[in-house]
């Protein structure tokens, strides 16, 4: 079964929120069908760090990335979620 790899940039509410803390909250909020394949901090400016994530999800997910974006946006400490890339992934 093929999956889709979604590259996201997640911006925190403020500069005090660290990417590692944000990652833990997001990972805990994601349903089982979503898998975090990779994550890293991305410096933005003035001490603000975004979180870049690659999340694997089933290819046949109805509505594309909308559900994933909504779940992450609802996590406390998240200000904005940007989908940077979506690609098919098999393996």
From Swiss-Prot:
SMART domains: EF1_GNE. CDD domains: EF1B. GO terms for molecular function: translation elongation factor activity. The keyword Protein biosynthesis applies. Keywords: Elongation factor, Protein biosynthesis. Gene3D superfamilies: 3.30.70.60. InterPro entries: eEF-1beta-like_sf, EF1B_bsu/dsu_GNE, Transl_elong_EF1B/ribsomal_bS6, Transl_elong_EF1B_B_arc. Promotes the exchange of GDP for GTP in EF-1-alpha/GDP, thus allowing the regeneration of EF-1-alpha/GTP that could then be used to form the ternary complex EF-1-alpha/GTP/AAtRNA. Belongs to the EF-1-beta/EF-1-delta family. This is Elongation factor 1-beta. It comes from Thermofilum pendens (strain DSM 2475 / Hrk 5). The lineage of its organism: Archaea, Thermoproteota, Thermoprotei, Thermofilales, Thermofilaceae.
């Amino acid at each position: 079964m093929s999956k889709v790899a979604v590259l996201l940039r997640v911006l925190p509410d403020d500069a005090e929120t660290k990417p590692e803390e944000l990652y833990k909250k997001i990972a805990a909020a994601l349903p089982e069908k979503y898998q975090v394949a990779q994550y890293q901090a991305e410096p933005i400016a003035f001490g603000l760090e975004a979180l870049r994530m690659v999340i694997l999800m089933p290819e046949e997910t109805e509505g594309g990335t909308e559900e994933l974006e909504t779940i992450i946006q609802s996590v406390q400490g998240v200000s904005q979620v940007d989908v940077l890339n979506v690609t098919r992934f098999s393996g």
